[in-house]
Amino acid sequence: MPSSKPLAEYARKRDFRQTPEPSGRKPRKDSTGLLRYCVQKHDASRLHYDFRLELDGTLKSWAVPKGPCLDPAVKRLAVQVEDHPLDYADFEGSIPQGHYGAGDVIVWDRGAWTPLDDPREGLEKGHLSFALDGEKLSGRWHLIRTNLRGKQSQWFLVKAKDGEARSLDRFDVLKERPDSVLSERTLLPRHGEAATPAARPARRGKSGGKTPMPEWIAPELASLVEQPPRGEWAYELKLDGYRLMSRIEDGHVRLLTRNGHDWTERLPHLEKALAGLGLQRSWLDGELVVLDEEGRPDFQALQNAFEEGRGENILYVLFDLPYHEGEDLRDVALEERRARLEALLEGRDEDPLRFSATLAEDPRDLLASACKLGLEGVIGKRLGSAYRSRRSNDWIKLKCQLRQEFVIVGYTEPKGSRRHIGALLLGLYSPDEERRLRYAGKVGSGFTAASLKKVRERLEPLAVRSSPLAKVPPARETGSVQWVRPQQLCEVSYAQMTRGGIIRQAVFHGLREDKPAREVTGERPAGPPPLRGARKASAGASRAATAGVRISHPQRLIDPSIQASKLELAEFHARYADLLLRDLRERPVSLVRGPDGIGGELFFQKHAARLKIPGIVQLDPALDPGHPPLLQIRSAEALVGAVQMGSIEFHTWNASLANLERPDRFVLDLDPDPALPWKRMLEATQLSLTLLDELGLRAFLKTSGGKGMHLLVPLERRHGWDEVKDFAQAISQHLARLMPERFSAVSGPRNRVGKIFVDYLRNSRGASTVAAYSVRAREGLPVSVPVFREELDSLQGANQWNLRSLPQRLDELAGDDPWADYAGTRQRISAAMRRQLGRG
């Protein structure tokens, strides 16, 4: 049981007249409904990290000497210390010498946490499992109490094996991301120690001072977004070319690709032009392009210029100056770096060096104009931002069409008058550490006679006998293929990507050779980047708001097979909340949660168990004695809030809150042997409906979103749980007796080989069925969709619709509702019905 004075030890150790730490006397009001989490980097007698989880009105706290680690193989000692007040999660400052914990403190990470089991029980038993949703740490974690001796309880902090885990030798989050998430501070080193370079805010009005010449500066990369963000931004045209960094030392010029390959010898005219700037120690950043007759960048022409030795046609459009004449400008504001660069290039209109001008138009108008002109899109850069050698939310790109690089995995032979190749087979690597190569479709248009010949010549030496793909697509999709080693990239535009990750209406634009094939994992538009200074309003980076709920990590993939993000899932639930709430609003709700997406661990949750979701209702504990409260979802806010906390599926009881002891429906879940053809499922559904017709009961149909069909039979609230379940079981057994070759009334895979199990078990008290219009946690994110009985013969599968194709389904219905008569259906179980089933 929580202490009546949980902060007594905290207060005893501190003199709040001297220390800036919060006293905790005024409890922090919780407006989000989320449980807070934070990690503070504390430079006390020894540098360590304080790990804190909100519970029962305080922050449970552990000192982690070596800090958190994303590697599940690494256990980090965590010494439990006194509880801290909730306000401490925002504390940054310097604790004076001579006081407890003297030294500097920054907020290294913060966000929300979700217990995966009862957290009080976990703390008592010594094993707390939870999910983090922070700016740096996320996914599932464990705190495990040890038997190590010490003055204080000693635990291990361990990362679980999930999609957020990373091996320590590949990524050390403490070294890679050392700074504050609250203020962009870094801890200063003690005397005689070296500090990790900090990601400081950009400076205005002064340079970085004379510093050693960097051997290499990796370029800053832009993040793909769907719409222009708010805030102060400068926009330029997006150039369809090759990224190039220029290093000038003692007047000697080197031209380097984004991966550090030296292209100086390939571009002597640019080497000469850059030398003509008279620079001695500088780095410049820009893009190689070739312009067509109308002055537009032409990627195919750029390739041809390299292939045909006509490099003099290549222009170098410069847009940044990260290092200038011995001064490191990476921490200087964007507009000041660009002003210096523009001055360098002034008056060189006939030169192959050009300046990428800032365009003053509204970004939406600018993008529309760029698209009309056939350009690739626009680039936005946040005013005041520093130059960072990584993909950044300070640089964004808005594209006119879906266009990206793909790995060529094979080609088909030409037909008819076409020569050299028919089509290219394309692949993309998975973004995880396993880097699996998956099939992404074909491209057969956009080629010229010359490019067909060139592509064939490039691919023939790469020919191999077997497919390089992790999963070979069916021959009907690919035809006869010559597979190749996955080394060559091409750039392709396309109209859409299907839920299976296959591109449609693809157009070839050229081969690429400026990056390794294994880097090509595909792009997915992100939400607008956060405003500078907006961190205090948000518990995590890269957030978006949907139905009034802030979505953390909006671009986290819920289903990599269709590149479906957490934000897309949240937006689906906001858009179709009215449909979902018809089933959810008046019933206890259970959740299927997958914080790491469908590929991670999934768990079923029917009780609150300290889970806080904005807008969700915790029901009277007396409804389910001996357990935490049941859950109820009444609003779009609660629905989207559940998605924010990792929920994917929503299940409901067969009784409403009007009378939880009297079910108002029963469900027959037709669950097939996976090997059965779909036709057998349709026949089984019709046979089950026929039996219900004979009994005088009307059923309403929906696809399960999985493999089977659900038949929902409304009832007047006259029967108890046992009576309803017994009746549903009688139907199941009756079908199995009549047609034992088709139906089974016994659960378990062994009992439904070649058959369909008529699952009646969902009719027990506390059992539940996936709600109508709920997404399923399966590949493709299918949806459980109501259908008319007359549509049965035309159904193609139980997973026919998913979160992206449901809008088309609803448009086709044009307002017709397959369940329009559901609420008005009045029927009950009679003695005559029982006798028909042999239960008289």
From Swiss-Prot:
User: How the protein is affected by changing residue 669 to A/N?
Assistant: Loss of templated DNA synthesis (in Pol domain)
**GO process annotations (BP):** DNA biosynthetic process; DNA recombination; DNA repair
Instruction: Tell me the residue numbers annotated for binding Mn(2+) 2.
Output: 240, 376
UniProt-reported outcome of changing residue 21 to A:
Loss of 3'-phosphatase activity (in PE domain)
Return the broad EC class.
ligase
Cofactors demanded by this protein: Mn(2+)
Region called 3'-phosphoesterase domain (PE), residue ranges: 7-162
Q: Which UniProt key words apply to this protein? A: ATP-binding, DNA damage, DNA recombination, DNA repair, DNA-binding, DNA-directed DNA polymerase, Exonuclease, Hydrolase, Ligase, Manganese, Metal-binding, Multifunctional enzyme, Nuclease, Nucleotide-binding, Nucleotidyltransferase, Transferase
What happens after mutating residue 42 to A? Loss of ribonuclease and 3'-phosphatase activity (in PE domain)
Q: What is the effect of changing residue 710 to A?
A: Loss of templated DNA synthesis (in Pol domain)
Region Ligase domain (Lig): what ranges? 219-521
Detail which positions bind Mn(2+) 1.
42, 48, 50
- Give the result of residue 52 to A, as annotated: Loss of nuclease and 3'-phosphatase activity (in PE domain)
Q: Which Pfam families match?
A: DNA_ligase_A_C, DNA_ligase_A_M, LigD_N, LigD_Prim-Pol
Q: Catalytic activity annotated for this protein?
A: ATP + (deoxyribonucleotide)n-3'-hydroxyl + 5'-phospho-(deoxyribonucleotide)m = (deoxyribonucleotide)n+m + AMP + diphosphate
Subunit structure of this chain's protein? Monomer. Interacts with Ku.
Q: Which family does it belong to?
A: In the N-terminal section; belongs to the LigD 3'-phosphoesterase family. In the central section; belongs to the ATP-dependent DNA ligase family.
* Domain comment as written in the entry: The N-terminal 3'-phosphoesterase domain (PE) has 3'-ribonuclease and 3'-phosphatase activities. The central ATP-dependent ligase domain (Lig) functions as an independent domain.
Descriptive protein name: Multifunctional non-homologous end joining protein LigD
